Amino acid sequence: MIDYHAKLLASLKEIGIPVHYEMTLYSGLSTPCISYMELSNVSTQAGDTLGYSRLQYQIKVWGTQISDLQKYALLIDKKLRPLGFSRVGCNEMYDNNSSMIQKIMTYECLALEQFD
């Protein structure tokens, strides 16, 4: 297992809007904003000194304007690509009660892990 949280968070924060861990979201946050959560972190290949882990993260853009969601989704792609991530899933969801729109994206990468 490899820990990519710090690299991912640093890249997302460079976008310039608030970034939150998905499990700590609460009502009343200012939007647009980004949330993230690790979906999967599994060892796919392992040797004596190194291995590979397949990582999946769910990244959401929250807002009330579809144009904001599209703009920030493209910026997220641009920031995560150099880390080796590619978008493997995407959908949108609207909440009638809050008038919030979510762009829900899944990113995946294969990460090299050095063993001590």
Language model features with spans:
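Acidic-leaning, charged glycine-interspersed low-complexity segments
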Residues: L74-D116
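Oligomerization/assembly interface segments of phage tail-like spikes and tubes
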Residues: G51-T64, I101-A111
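Intrinsically disordered, low-complexity acidic/polar segments
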Residues: Q45, D68, Q114-D116
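Mid-chain, well-packed structural core segment of small domains
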Residues: I59-P82
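Short, solvent-exposed beta-strand/turn "edge" segments of beta-rich domains on protein surfaces
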Residues: A46-G51, N96-S98
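Small/polar-rich, solvent-exposed N-terminal microdomains that initiate assembly or binding
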Residues: M1-T49, T64, K71-Y72
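Short intrinsically disordered coil segments
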Residues: T49-R54, L74-I76
